[in-house]
């Protein structure tokens, strides 16, 4: 599968390599890569921003890929299980955002209302662990599986 892109040749080559890398995760885990999963992966690679379910459905439909929200949701859960994507919940809007996991990382996130994008809050791992430490004592939440999304605006001097 080769991605079609309106971007530069370098972007297209990077996107194709990225897609191949994600496909190899399915192969290593002996997971079936269905056409709908491949199309969803391709959509996430091409549109690197954060996505809601509705946005993903819209992107797929623009490329003549008929699908349902339930199918997209189920595939995203599989992607999360394989650690291909991060899932973030904006508690003010009750919206869930999905993004490809380009590297293994630990962050606390902030959604900047003005810029309409996620930024990393300047917390060290120990500070983050202390914020959720009461839950991690029971072994149910690991730092890498727990993300905080705060809303508001981030000033330049912060």
Swiss-Prot record:
GO terms for biological process: negative regulation of DNA-templated transcription; regulation of secondary metabolite biosynthetic process. SUPFAM superfamilies: Winged helix' DNA-binding domain. Signal peptide: none annotated. Coiled coil: none annotated. Gene3D superfamilies: Winged helix-like DNA-binding domain superfamily/Winged helix DNA-binding domain. InterPro entries: FUR, WH-like_DNA-bd_sf, WH_DNA-bd_sf. GO terms for molecular function: DNA-binding transcription factor activity; transcription cis-regulatory region binding; zinc ion binding. It comes from the Bacteria. This is Uncharacterized protein MG236 homolog. It comes from Mycoplasma pneumoniae (strain ATCC 29342 / M129 / Subtype 1) (Mycoplasmoides pneumoniae). The lineage of its organism: Bacteria, Bacillati, Mycoplasmatota, Mycoplasmoidales, Mycoplasmoidaceae.
